[in-house]
Amino acid sequence: MSNLSRRNFITGGAIAALGGTLAIAGCAPKGESSSTVAGAAGEGAQAWTGTANGKGGELTVEVITEGDSIARINPLKSRESYGVGTAGIDVLSDLIVKNQTLNVDMVTGATVSSMAFLTAVSDAVDASGMKSSEWKKREKAVPQAPEGLTTDVDVVVVGAGGAGYAAALTAAEAGKNVVLLEKLGIVGGDTILSGGAMAVPNNWFQKRDGIEDSVEKMAEDMIVGGDHVGDPDLVNVICEGAYGAMEWLIFNGGVAWQPYERFFGGHSVIRSLIPEGNEGSGIICKLDKRAEGLKNLKVCRNTKADELVQDASGAVVGLKATNTATGETYDFKAKAVILAAGGFGSNVEMRMKYNPEMDEKILSTDSVGATGDCHVMAEKIGANLIDMQYIQTYPTCDTQTGALLYVGNMRLENRAICINKEGDRFVEEMERRDVISNAIKEQTDGIGYMIFNQDGLDHTDIATVNAAEMDGLFGRGQLAKGETIAEACEPFGIDAAELQKTVEKWNGYCKDGADPDFNYRAALNPIEGGPYYILAYKPSVHYTMGGLHINTDAQVLDSDAAPIPGLFAAGEQAGHKMGTNRLGSCSITDVFVFGRVAGANAAALA
């Protein structure tokens, strides 16, 4: 572990427009140019607008033209996800302007946002009098590898998610030459798609609020929450390293945290920090910026790991990879390789190989890149896979897309109760994820609902931070609002009379300070007075507990439990830490603790 210095602290300023509309001036009507753009481009520049539907809703762009060329592209209105959709848009905008072409591929990992952006830009180009169809026939532009990339390095890291960035930055901070490979066109993995919550025992908010906690208590929660299947030694590394990893994120990464914590199911006390912006992008985007400032670290997007290279003794001494955008192949030589490419939740075939119940009927919250490529790659050289049958579902996900519902965090804010179509509660809302998921499967249509009211919503920042998600859910009939409980029930066909009784009973429990039905373990907050909201949800595959077997030094083990020299793994890539089930917010702790462990130990070999 490197020494931490407050001189290295980078303040975490507010991240603008997270999940919301970019507050830029309104746009001109379609097909109508603005007046000459003063001071923004060359003489005679004009602005044209185009609109399309993105993943977050309406996307409007302004294209600045100078004669027959595109000088600049500005998003006027966008609710695309920060660090994901916005990253894809940035890539395409740069390619289009630099190469004067619309012949570009969609950015993998941000496909929907990319398609919408290209459609909107094409719309604006047509409005200018030029023909987008002709621009799309021009020479194709593709993202290029980082300038100065060399294949002779000290450490290769595969997967630019939380664990990958932690490993790569730690090794680079130790003075080693590092390359970080990401097969998608954007970085972040599942970390950037998550809420970014991080379980940290003995943190300053607990001390402020008089909450007693300890490393041992968190470790016990994780072991019990995973039904005593996880390796206690690995769990202890996570819990003991949590506070240091949190400090590293602040002082070395510039990550800022909200001034409150969140209670996740299965934990015995509240201990989970929330990043500024309430999303994993509040962490990943800061780490990516930190990486950009290091000359000895190169981040290679669109670069897929193909094969591990070993010497005569069996030690891993490099890796073969392919740039999927350019077709260029690389033969990296390194003293160590760190695999941090996440799980396999998006690979249905692989899921069913280890757990036949996890078939295509169950959607996934995971990144499209979570396909288990590196599990297979490492297994080919003798690495041991462990706990692969344990696959977690997240209980409150979109019934149509499978995406994790952040509006569903009303449950974690202790402001909602879980009900079924019959209007009854069916589970303790703060239970383990697997317990809630299994309970939902037993309900009518395999769907659960949660009810909350305006007062509860106003006690959180959920409506503000997740405005785009709420609008989308209303539009697709997955979220309903009514002045009365009966009005909110109507779109879903929920038994309103029974739900009225359930809410009244709940409010009584809140006054009494106890829940005799399900022994609710968090703060009891009543749901009194409208307007009322009801959200539909069902479980989606969220996390794969199994992966490469590692030891406490993050070394990958073979079938005889012996370390494979030169090979490390971290994050969801590595198994046998969580057991049968993972407690919420422990994954973020894991990726940054073991990412740093892997990075430090890999650097020690170089």
Swiss-Prot record:
Give the EC number.
Answer: 1.3.99.33
- Gene3D superfamilies this protein is in? 3.90.1010.20, FAD/NAD(P)-binding domain, Succinate dehydrogenase/fumarate reductase flavoprotein, catalytic domain
- For the modification FMN phosphoryl threonine, which residues carry it? T111
What PANTHER family is this protein classified in? FAD-DEPENDENT OXIDOREDUCTASE 2 FAD BINDING DOMAIN-CONTAINING PROTEIN, FUMARATE REDUCTASE
What residues make up the catalytic site?
R433 (proton donor)
* Record note on modification: Predicted to be exported by the Tat system. The position of the signal peptide cleavage has not been experimentally proven.
* Keyword Transmembrane attributed: no
Gene Ontology CC annotations of this record: membrane
Binding of FAD occurs at A163, E182, T191, G195, G196, A197, A305, D373, E572, I588
Q: Which NCBIfam families match?
A: flavo_cyto_c
The record's free-text note on cofactor binding: Binds 1 FAD per subunit. Binds 1 FMN covalently per subunit.
Q: Which organism is it from?
A: Eggerthella lenta (strain ATCC 25559 / DSM 2243 / CCUG 17323 / JCM 9979 / KCTC 3265 / NCTC 11813 / VPI 0255 / 1899 B) (Eubacterium lentum)
Regions annotated as coiled coil: none
Question: Which Pfam families does its entry note?
Answer: FAD_binding_2, FMN_bind
User: Would the keyword Flavoprotein be found if you checked this record's keyword annotation?
Assistant: yes
Q: What PROSITE patterns does the record tag this protein with?
A: TAT
What protein is this chain from?
Urocanate reductase
Function noted in UniProt: Catalyzes the two-electron reduction of urocanate to dihydrourocanate (also named imidazole propionate or deamino-histidine). Dihydrourocanate is present at higher concentrations in subjects with type 2 diabetes, and directly impairs glucose tolerance and insulin signaling at the level of insulin receptor substrate (IRS) through activation of p38 gamma (MAPK12)-p62-mTORC1. Therefore, the UrdA enzyme from the gut bacteria E.lenta strain DSM 2243 may contribute to the pathogenesis of type 2 diabetes by producing the microbial metabolite dihydrourocanate.
Q: Which GO terms describe its molecular function?
A: FMN binding; steroid dehydrogenase activity, acting on the CH-CH group of donors
The prosthetic group or cofactor this protein requires is: FAD; FMN
What UniProt keywords are attached to this protein's entry? FAD, Flavoprotein, FMN, Oxidoreductase, Phosphoprotein, Signal
What family is it from? Belongs to the FAD-dependent oxidoreductase 2 family. FRD/SDH subfamily.
Q: What else is known?
A: E.lenta strain DSM 2243 is significantly more abundant in subjects with type 2 diabetes (T2D) compared with subjects with normal glucose tolerance (NGT).
Cleavable signal peptide = 1-40
* Catalytic activity field: dihydrourocanate + A = urocanate + AH2
